[in-house]
Swiss-Prot record:
Chief localisation class: cytoplasm
Official protein name in the record: NAD kinase
UniProt source species: Haemophilus influenzae (strain 86-028NP)
Cross-referenced InterPro entries: ATP-NAD_kinase_N (IPR017438), ATP-NAD_kinase_PpnK-typ_C (IPR017437), NAD/diacylglycerol_kinase_sf (IPR016064), NADK (IPR002504)
Gene: nadK
Compartment(s) where it occurs, according to its Swiss-Prot or TrEMBL record: Cytoplasm
Amino acid sequence: MNHLYRSFKTIALVGKPRNDINLQMHKNLFHWLMERGYQVLVEKEVAITLELPFEHLATLEEIGHRAQLAIVIGGDGNMLGRARVLAKYDIPLIGINRGNLGFLTDIDPKNAYSQLEACLERGEFFVEERFLLEAKIERASEIVSTSNAVNEAVIHPAKIAHMIDFHVYINDKFAFSQRSDGLIVSTPTGSTAYSLSAGGPILTPNLNAIALVPMFPHKLTSRPLVVDGDSKISIRFAEHNTSQLEVGCDSQITLPFTPDDVVHIQKSEHKLRLLHLKNYNYYNVLSSKLGWLKSF
């Protein structure tokens, strides 16, 4: 076999299978890669379930240090969870879509092996970088908790259907005050996720921009605001707010805080590196996922 175009020697399989079909795909792909001479690592929990030899077991951190590519099997949720961890290791990710929409998972499971062969064996791919957000909780002038987010950081009360009052500062300058169910702070990657459902704008992935999208604001003039991607966003809260507030990162990580704390959100120093097939077209993804069909 011609290995002229091979860019990767060690490839990791990651994801959390929801059913036997997804688990079987992990197993099949493991053997497919092994047969082609790749060194293969498999996320620890899956490898144990599949009873793979010990040398193939690896945590996400070990994968970050040892692998040159991670293949995510699952939906966007699986991609988000792995991307937050692996971004700091500068390892590219490509996804096989086993979820619903699949904005971040390019590969069609029906054509997975032919598409992977084009990518891995013939070098028919390119790498796209996308920025992450970093959310921090400041308490008494000290940072007490932090998390990255690929899609969005959402400020909201711990209990549903509770409104909160807050002020938003951009680069330490007052921008606006709001009474609402919360605020979505979204990356361009996240603009087609929760932000879109809340009426936020779609931002193409190459934009250096952050969207601030209110959640059920108690003011008809409240509208989404798009700011420079290098902005530092700070949110301060009224004392009469409920004592249990949260920042949700990609709906997977929760940072609790109180009205006395300050939430800071800005671009993370780490970037998500997405590996795309050569014929990838972002606008085709939008039209297929959102039903933007040609009328003539």
